[in-house]
Design a protein with these regions (language model features):
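Short, low-complexity, charge-dense intrinsically disordered segments
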Residues: 1-17, 21-28, 32, 37-40, ...
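Short, gly/Ser/Thr-rich active-site loops of penicillin-recognizing serine hydrolases
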Residues: 373-439, 443
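Short, well-ordered beta-strand elements
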Residues: 347-348, 358-375, 488-489, 498-504
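Short, conserved catalytic-motif segment at the N-terminal edge
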Residues: 61-121, 141-146, 189, 198, ...
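Short, surface-exposed loop or secondary-structure junction motifs
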Residues: 102-107, 159-353, 358
Length: 506
């Protein structure tokens, strides 16, 4: 069955722009603001009617109960993180069982989100780049074991052992965009590649794992070299059009595109439009796609079939990468692969230009959850986990209250330090003399590396406590992944140095 939510266009949505995304120290005004936002969201969601479809699976009591929980999770997230709009779908066996739209696609013009609304999807686009590569593999036009130097003869000597498989699995040693890449400047593919070549590899190909946007940009260039077509055109021809993904396409700020959502961010508590980037940096194969929730529902349905990807191809895509030392990393081709709470999941998120998104596929129960949001403030890993818990209580979030972050400079410092621990290299000047003799850098690194995407989760850490102890300030931060949570406790001296740091599971 399908639980359809048709969002009516109604005047009460006008409440949202006045209050969403604004913080105030005046508690009475804050309470009023929250009540008005609750009222606005309640009126908007009240316009949604849940009706059974003529085809598909029958409704179950569990589905209806879960739908109620999902609704509560979405509303709470929108209020907590000041998210203007959300589009969400839940599918089982490729059939939609819940489709809902919340809030505004465009705050300035009071345009509500609807199922046809298209969002920038960020790195969700990587799975489509990977699918395009596998189509070429299926047609014997490309080999996963092929050295990319065959297609890039001017690549540096350090790249000689990088294979197509390495690029797909983030095991190539290529890092992220080098410092000389300015996201506000246009580049040709040759100019991108010239900048990539200058950067040293982070490690020898196949020996380690590091999430690499550069690797997927390179895959997009490779698709053109093999097919003679821009990767976006290849996706249209071989995936989007055949599957009826009628609004899926590469991002364009210039084109007139119906139902396009606007992206937003908070600046000092005020809602602002997304930051601008150049057209060329918004058209690369690491995640530059417009997608609606309906497009992604059709994609999920296709992943239950042998079109466009055969079972053999899907198996390869969803196999965790194995490094040269025999260890495995929880990433295949454009998907994280996780085993959590007795479930096997394949997941991926996206974060780009005022949008955050996620798709979760429970492979054992054939349940898929997809959401698209138009706010950079969305804690997408935490949001995804809360939605999963609506169906599987073992994914429930820890009972820890997030508090307003009144010291963003401290938060920035803690995140910077955790980033250093994540790579195993810390700046000793940030600490008092004895700390690093008492703390195991490797132990903290191992805890952080257990996250599916440590960098993203560190950057989404949330303040959960501030106290004072022996003339020192004590800060506690929550880090949340799909199946686990950590609390980082940091003590700070009066001169601003870290006197203690602990990362513990909860």
């Amino acid at each position: 069955m399908v639980l359809l939510c048709d969002l009516c266009v109604s005047a009460p949505s006008a409440f949202i722009p006045q209050y969403i995304g604004k913080y105030t120290r005046d508690s009475e005004r804050e309470t009023l603001n929250r009540k008005l936002v609750v009222l606005a969201l309640t009126i908007i969601v009240y316009c949604c009617s849940i009706t059974p479809a003529r085809q598909g699976e029958s409704s179950t009591k569990e589905d209806r109960a879960a739908a109620t929980r999902v609704d509560r999770v979405v509303k709470e997230a929108m209020l907590t993180y000041k998210i203007p709009g959300v589009s969400l779908a839940v599918l089982r066996n490729g059939q939609i069982i819940l489709l809902k739209s919340y809030g505004l696609a465009n705050v300035e013009h009071q345009i509500p989100v609807k199922p046809e609304t298209i969002f920038q999807s960020g790195s969700i686009g990587k799975q489509f780049t990977a699918a395009a590569i596998m189509i070429l593999v299926q047609e014997n036009k490309l080999s996963l074991d092929a050295k990319i130097s065959r297609y890039f003869p001017d690549s540096p000597a350090a790249w000689k052992d990088i294979t197509v498989w390495n690029l797909l699995t983030h095991t190539s040693g290529l890092g992220d965009y080098p410092p000389e890449i300015d996201l506000r400047r246009d580049y040709t593919e040759d100019e991108f590649f010239a900048a990539f070549k200058k950067a040293p590899l982070d490690f020898a190909p196949g020996t380690n794992w590091n999430y690499s946007n550069v690797g997927y940009v390179t895959l997009g260039i490779l698709i053109r070299k093999v097919t003679g077509k821009y990767y976006g055109d290849f996706l249209q021809e071989r995936i989007f059009k055949p599957l009826g993904m009628t609004t899926a396409r590469v991002i364009s700020e210039e084109d007139i595109i119906p139902n396009r959502a606007s992206g937003y961010r908070l600046v000092k508590g005020q809602l602002k439009n997304q930051e601008w980037v150049s057209p060329s940096t918004n058209s690369t194969a690491d995640g530059s796609l417009y997608l609606s929730i309906l497009d992604l529902a059709k994609w999920d349905a296709a992943l239950h079939t042998d079109t466009p990807l055969t079972q053999a191809s899907r198996n390869k895509i969803w196999t965790p990468a194995q490094l040269s030392d025999g260890t495995t990393k929880g990433y295949g081709f454009g998907w994280h692969i996780l085993n959590l709470h007795g479930h096997r999941l394949i997941v991926h998120g996206g974060a780009w230009q005022g949008f955050k998104t996620h798709i979760l596929r429970f492979m054992d129960t054939k349940l898929t959850i997809v959401f698209l949001t138009n706010s950079w403030e969305t804690r997408d890993f935490k949001f995804a986990r809360a939605l999963a818990a609506s169906f599987y209580p073992s994914f429930a979030l820890p009972d820890v209250n997030v508090i307003p972050d009144t010291d963003p400079k401290m938060t920035s410092l803690v995140r910077r330090v955790l980033m250093q621990f994540n790579v195993g290299k810390v700046d000793e000047q940030l600490f008092t003399p004895d700390v690093l003799r008492l703390v195991s850098i490797k132990a903290i690194q191992n805890k952080l590396n257990a996250f599916s995407l440590p960098v993203a989760i560190i950057n989404s850490s949330e303040l959960v406590g501030i106290s004072h102890e022996n003339n020192e300030r004590v800060y506690r931060y929550l880090l949340t992944d799909f199946g686990s949570s950590l609390v980082c406790t940091v003590k700070l001296t009066q001169d601003g140095r870290i006197s203690a740091i602990e990362v513990s599971s909860i």
